[in-house]
């Protein structure tokens, strides 16, 4: 996703009009493989594609429950498939733009030139933007702490109206913490459809069914027992001050 968003930015900048751009993707990007949710105070470049916007939120913890306005901000949900389609429709046939479906085997960076070894051959460039994430360097060190923000989410459709579509449940900490930081996150699309995520901040990940048990337990506690799971998603975001930028070179930039 970051590579396609970078392509959009480059192709909308006149400076790169005559630059040749090669995009290498292992898989064709045309599905909802991720969901972005973000704050914005004004109209943004993706407003025509957002699934939902909210201007109110709810926060819960043990013995605490309050609603608040987000003004002047809005919280926005954006699904990836519509972004992929928009960028590919606008830029896949653009002049000096080439898409290659291939697996990247190795990236060899020298100061002024980077070589990319793929399943379809080798390529060289004076400037490479790399969105592949290799956690080994981050995990094989002790200087910078690493905390994981990890989650599993369900897009569900309930049999009965169950959600207030005007506000997000930004965080509900009123669940068993088990000596960690755990919360539920709920984005209601309408009265019957919502994204429900079970999220943790912790050192270690859980087995997949442990996240799903957390979602089921939460829905049961709210009296929501009849629903259809439309989609599932899973994510893990490292929270660290590890200096990734130190791996950049003159010809290779990690994004």
Question: What is each of the regions a protein language model found here?
Answer:
Residues 5-64:
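N-terminal FAD cofactor-binding segment of flavoenzymes
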Residues 9-13, 93-228, 240-245:
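Predominantly flavin-linked oxidoreductase catalytic cores and closely associated redox partners
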Residues 40-102, 106-112:
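A conserved beta-strand/loop capping segment in the N-terminal third of enzymes
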Residues 244-255:
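Conserved mid-domain beta->alpha element of the FAD-binding
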């Amino acid at each position: 996703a970051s590579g396609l968003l970078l392509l959009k930015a480059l192709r909308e900048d006149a400076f790169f009009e005559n630059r040749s751009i090669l995009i290498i993707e292992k898989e064709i990007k045309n599905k909802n493989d991720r969901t972005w949710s973000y704050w914005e105070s004004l109209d943004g470049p993706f407003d025509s594609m957002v699934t939902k916007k909210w201007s109110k939120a709810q926060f819960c913890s043990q013995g605490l429950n309050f609603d608040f306005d987000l003004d002047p901000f809005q919280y926005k949900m954006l699904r990836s498939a519509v972004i992929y389609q928009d960028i590919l429709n606008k830029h896949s046939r653009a002049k000096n733009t080439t898409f290659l479906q291939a697996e990247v085997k190795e990236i060899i960076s020298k100061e002024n030139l980077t070589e990319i070894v793929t399943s379809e051959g080798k390529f060289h460039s004076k400037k490479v933007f790399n969105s592949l994430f290799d956690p080994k360097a981050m995990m094989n060190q002790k200087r910078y702490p690493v905390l994981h923000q990890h989650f599993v989410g369900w897009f569900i459709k309930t049999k009965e109206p169950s959600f207030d579509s005007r506000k997000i449940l930004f965080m509900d900490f009123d669940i068993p913490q088990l000596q960690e930081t755990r919360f539920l996150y709920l984005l209601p699309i309408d009265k019957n459809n919502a994204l429900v995520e079970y999220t943790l901040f912790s050192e270690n990940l859980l087995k997949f069914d442990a996240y799903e048990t957390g979602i089921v337990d939460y829905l049961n506690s709210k009296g929501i027992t009849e629903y259809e799971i439309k989609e599932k998603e899973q994510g893990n975001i490292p929270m660290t001050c590890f200096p990734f930028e130190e791996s950049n070179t003159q010809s290779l930039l990690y994004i």
